[in-house]
């Protein structure tokens, strides 16, 4: 069970994005290639989940089809990278950081870890949006369909019965990961994915800041810490019905 879960998450969140990035994005940094590959895999997933919603197709069949399509593209990317890289391996570069930069990096990482621990161990979900998204993931898993049954009554529903919640694919993405890993979709959605979502959000934000500050590492790290503080303040002002990290976790959902 544990090995299956680890293999499933590594495949979906690491191996496939790496391979698809190498296949679809050339001449860019490894980080940008990985992010591009991951979003390409999400693009294919979004198309498939809408098609299977309309046709009332099987969640498990959609999962298999997604794995085959993305796996084939990733395999091609690794094959092309290996073929192109023979005899032309780049030298490893050593990155030197000042003491101030190390301190800023440590603070940024510590705040990320704090937010992950709070989300995984201490988050109370008390809002309609999150409850509906999570129940969509669970209902899809049990009914083997894509948002075609009410998570409240169990009744069969028509196409796009509630567009706001049906079009959002992240709950179904959680259900797909549940199919692959064997872990209940509510656990995937609320406990496991935030461990990925929070660092990913900050990696993307840090990349944007790095570009904005013309690769000035110190300014980039300072900007990232200010962004983390802003997220913390927004969380404190959210209204009292939940202690979720809205700007970091909930943005993935809808």
Predicted regions and their residues:
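Membrane-embedded, hydrophobic transmembrane alpha-helices
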Residues: 1-97
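Hydrophobic alpha-helical transmembrane segments
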Residues: 6, 35-39, 105-108, 222-226
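Hydrophobic membrane-spanning alpha-helices of multi-pass integral membrane proteins
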Residues: 37-50, 227-237, 254
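Hydrophobic alpha-helical transmembrane segments and adjacent interfacial helices
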Residues: 43-53, 110-118, 178
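Non-cytosolic membrane-interface motifs at loop->transmembrane helix junctions
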Residues: 59-64, 245-252
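Hydrophobic core of alpha-helical transmembrane segments in multi-pass integral membrane proteins
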Residues: 64-81, 106-116, 229-233
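Loop-to-transmembrane boundary segments
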Residues: 97-110, 120
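Active-site lumenal/periplasmic loops and adjacent helix-entry segments of GT-C-fold
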Residues: 113-250
